[in-house]
Amino acid sequence: MSSKLPTTLLRRPSALPSTTTYTAYSASRPTPPSCTAHGAQGQQIRNATFVPRHRRPYQFTQLVQLSDGSTFTVRTTMPTALYKSAKDSRNHLLWQPSDKSLKNVELDEAGKLAAFRERYGRGWDLDAKMTPEEEAAAAAALAAGGGAGVPGGKAAKKAAEEALLAKKKKEEEEAAKKAAEAEEADPFDSLTDLISGYATENMNPGLNFKETRHYGKKK
């Protein structure tokens, strides 16, 4: 005959707080004083306050090198010891007019400019006057670019066309210059021409508005 286990061992312990009261313990322990409304009002509460302070990050001593080679030191938060500035006021044509690296040199290694001029001419070039040395160098570069893989007759023809276009452009500039000088000499002539271009001839002189209106209706 098997023995029966007690039921208290098989019962799962509960997570809820026990409701059993111990009268002997509660009687011997003094009860805490209850907090009244008057006591809650009289108690002072001090909360923490934020005190604003200036942020002072750590700064490093940095050496700044400009494009012309000059250097100076600054205090900055960047930890880099040497900073090479590529954009500064000294890297400008007005500050360094004799610097060769700042000159606008035309590089046509792929031959795109030569192909454009061959198709559309030199009317899109800048109006800056070229020195004889630059003109000779441009003519030599054009001949070298046109002669590569092209017969000599074609290169000579292109050179002749370029010379003709340059001559025509020069003549147009001279004509425009003469016209501007003529306008500066007598500005009233140009104003008179402008007014006369918009003026209309009066076909019925000596008639007022009413007579002019009925002039065409007379038989």
Swiss-Prot record:
Gene expressing this chain: mrpl36
Organism (species): Neurospora crassa (strain ATCC 24698 / 74-OR23-1A / CBS 708.71 / DSM 1257 / FGSC 987)
A single GO BP: mitochondrial translation
Pfam families with a match to the protein in the record: bL31_N (PF21492)
Gene3D superfamilies listed in its UniProt record: 6.20.130.10
Family membership noted in the UniProt record: Belongs to the bacterial ribosomal protein bL31 family. Highly divergent.
UniProt biased composition (Basic and acidic residues): 169-181, 210-219
Its job: Component of the mitochondrial ribosome (mitoribosome), a dedicated translation machinery responsible for the synthesis of mitochondrial genome-encoded proteins, including at least some of the essential transmembrane subunits of the mitochondrial respiratory chain. The mitoribosomes are attached to the mitochondrial inner membrane and translation products are cotranslationally integrated into the membrane.
Listed name of the protein: Large ribosomal subunit protein bL31m
Main location: mitochondrion
Region named Disordered: 169-188, 200-219
Gene Ontology CC terms, in alphabetical order: mitochondrial large ribosomal subunit
Classification lineage: Eukaryota, Fungi, Dikarya, Ascomycota, Pezizomycotina
